[in-house]
Amino acid sequence: HISQDLVKYSEQSLFDLFHKHAPNATMIVALGNHDSAPSDVAAPSNLPDGLADQLSWDWDNVAALVKSEGWGDNVTSEKIRTHYGGYSISPRQGLRVISLNTDMWYRNNPFSYLNIDNPDPSHMLRWLTDELQAAEDNNERAWIVGHVLPGWDGGDSIDNPTNLLYHIVSRFSHTIAHSFFGHKHEDMFHVWYESQSGNSSSVSRKTQNARAMAFIGPSITPLHNVNPSLRVYHVDPETYEVMDYSQYYTQLYNFEKLNKTGPVWELLYKARDTYSNFSMSEKQGKYTAPVRLENGTWPKSAPLNASFWAALTDEMEVRPELIQLHQLYQGRNSPKSPACDTKECYEAKLCYMRSASSNLGRHCPSGFGSVQSF
């Protein structure tokens, strides 16, 4: 049973643990669908009869914890209370991190269906736009962080908010260095392309039109038959773009030993070493990213940006063994992950990777979005 006391206790314990082991780091908090009681619920501020305040205890708790741990000041705390647990912060000069409560577009949040024709009843996306405009005006780069992904197979979010987000990301793509989401417990990504909306009829998913991308990170929690995992990003300190990342995992078959030794984290793969060879698509005339390759390989000086990941989907089309490898890494080398070795699976995976809105994802072939066994 998930109660308010349990949520508060969990948040306090987790934040204290982070602060203990990384006392000089600024932790960025992004609330997910299990960070409320009941789960999956976030109420927008325009509800009548006090209904909008039923989750205010959660925002108040997070605001107090962020301040007490030294990760924000009074201004940060007020933003958290105002924006449903979301806030913006500048941990380094030239970088603005914007945390969103993505339960506002979560398909399982019952309040998402009130005023459903309005893409932003909570005004969260308006606030995001204001933050991105301020970042643009101040020549800052922005990271967007959240829990529920806006796209992939279309099963987690609703259409109107993620269509509006698509337009916002397209407008501010030069300001947004990267976006980071989770929720699925799996290793995935998706790309935004130039578009005024996330509707399938308006998006030309061509690599030369790639504008932004989102890392959908795997989880430490194994959930259903995937191995625990954690990721270390290697970031350019001036542009705040990701140059590489290292993915670590631990095998669950060692679980009985963990109470004596703790988990042993092994390197599973590095993104650049694994995915930066585009020689086959270049040879076949299908490489169209605006970056000149070096002997068929993505230059070491170039970031792993939207063009990189869009070009990777083109390379996967001509080298489907890369899709199979991505499928293996999606479950972090889990023996329980199903193979992706059919034309139907290949086409579905490529479609998901090119779908950064719910609408786009739902127009992809269904049934191949997850590697977990439920």
Segment roles from a protein language model:
Residues 50-96, 101-109, 113-134, 138, ...:
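Metal-dependent phosphoesterase/phosphodiesterase active-site architecture
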Residues 29-40, 106-108, 148-155, 159, ...:
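Active-site environment of divalent metal-dependent phosphoester hydrolases
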Residues 26-31, 35-38, 88-90, 96-100, ...:
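Structural recognition of the beta-strand scaffold that forms the well-ordered cores
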Residues 13-30, 161-180, 185, 197-221:
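Histidine/cysteine- and/or acidic
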Residues 6-12, 81, 157-161, 225:
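Short, glycine/acidic-rich beta->alpha junctions
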Residues 1-53:
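Core catalytic region of metal-dependent phosphoesterases/phosphodiesterases
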Residues 14-15, 41-59, 155-169, 197-201:
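Short, electropositive alpha-helical surface patch
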Residues 107-126, 133-181, 191:
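Active-site-proximal segments of metal-dependent phosphoesterases and phosphodiesterases across multiple
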